[in-house]
A protein has these predicted regions:
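Short helix-loop capping/hinge motifs at secondary-structure junctions, enriched
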Residues: 39-44, 112
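Short beta-strand-to-turn element immediately C-terminal to the catalytic PLP-Schiff-base lysine
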Residues: 32-39, 107
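PLP-dependent enzyme catalytic core of the Aspartate aminotransferase-like
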Residues: 122-131, 135-165
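Conserved PLP-dependent catalytic core of the aminotransferase class-I/II
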Residues: 43, 63, 67-97, 119
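Active-site pre-lysine segment of PLP-dependent enzymes
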Residues: 1-24
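Conserved PLP-binding catalytic core of the aspartate aminotransferase-like
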Residues: 80, 84, 92-126, 142, ...
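Short acidic/glycine-enriched loop/turn segments that link adjacent beta-strands
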Residues: 29, 101, 137-140
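Active-site PLP-lysine loop of aminotransferase-like
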Residues: 16-28, 45-56, 134-135
Length: 165
């Protein structure tokens, strides 16, 4: 189950919890987020942060996103639905994957004869962009962002063809 971590923040003075608008809010390019911390930590961070560190358009977009709870709830349902579908589909394909509570899923090809770099190339040739994880020390794996329903269906179709299942 998902844990916000707020219990850690409530029980310890040295805990900082950060959140981003990049994932569920879909505002990755704006680099906007927020955090929870004790007043002492917030004061220390405020002394070293640059002035005007977030532009007005980004603040406006983040503010609008936070107020639109109907859209957020719809997006959460979409991500949860597709997390479950992709988890089951990748399981059928014998791909190693972790249960995810985010808008992306990590898949590993160690139990298959095909390597992640080849799958990456074949998906890219089909217009499906995923992220290689080798640069993060996670070998033979890809990170797949949950997209729109049609994009996810295309991914499943293409993965079945690549793996001949």
């Amino acid at each position: 189950d998902y844990s916000s971590g707020l219990n850690l923040f409530s029980n310890f003075k040295n805990v900082v919890i950060t959140r981003t608008f990049s994932k569920i809010y879909g505002l990755a390019g704006l680099r906007v987020g927020w955090g929870y911390a004790s007043k002492d930590i917030i004061n220390a961070l405020s002394r070293i942060k640059p002035p005007f560190n977030v532009g007005r358009p980004a603040l406006f977009a983040a503010s609008a996103a936070i107020r639109d709870s109907a859209w957020l709830n719809k997006e959460i349902k979409h991500v949860n639905k597709w997390n479950e579908i992709l988890f089951k589909e990748f399981n059928k394909m014998k791909i190693i994957k972790n249960k995810s509570f985010t808008n992306f899923i990590l898949i590993n090809f160690d139990k298959l004869k095909i390597k992640s770099h080849k799958v990456f190339r074949l998906l890219a040739n089909s217009g499906i962009l995923v992220r290689k994880m080798d640069v993060y020390g996670i070998k033979n794996s890809l990170r797949i962002t949950i997209g729109k329903s049609m994009e996810n269906k295309k991914l499943i179709f293409r993965m079945r063809r690549i793996l001949n299942v």
